[in-house]
Amino acid sequence: MKKKKPCIALIADEFTTYGLAPDADILPLTPFDWRWKLRLFKPDFLFVESAWRGYRNSWQGKIASYENKPDNNNELKKIVEYCKRKKIKTVFWNKEDPFHFERFSDSASFFDIIYTTDADSINRYDSLLDHRCQSVGVLMFAAQPHWYKPVPQVKRKYGVAFFGGYYGNQF
């Protein structure tokens, strides 16, 4: 018997969406359609990442904190509160730690479970949240085997590839 895929209500950028899609039924949420989608599809859990844009750019500027927009994450908070009332687990993944911890920590504080890509940020979440969430843990980036399959070795010209970001003089 084939195992049923989990249904994930998702607020994420494209990279994460594509990574999860082969293993889950994805329900992309926007600030405009989340009410009817959550009522109709009853997901297994809500997964929100530290997205800069989200599905079709609908979350741009609505998850990260900005000084000139103090209430920009109100819609996200409403979604999390709805999910908690309906007993839907809520998960936040900050893939921008440690550099953007402050930018996403307010939104992260709404959730039951918080994941970070930086083990050193766990204590920061624990002290910030005063143990309001159920757990804080590490969730590293991964490769989706469906998209990144090993291929037979062929003779290649080797070069250099850099995957990362430039943060100037922050350290």
Short names for language-model regions:
Residues 47, 91-92, 161:
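Structural recognition of the beta-strand scaffold that forms the well-ordered cores
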Residues 44-45, 89, 113:
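Structural motif
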Residues 18, 68-69, 73-77, 87-100:
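Conserved nucleotide-sugar donor-binding subdomain of glycosyltransferases
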Residues 1-41, 50-61, 66-72, 113, ...:
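Nucleotide-sugar donor-binding catalytic core of glycosyltransferases
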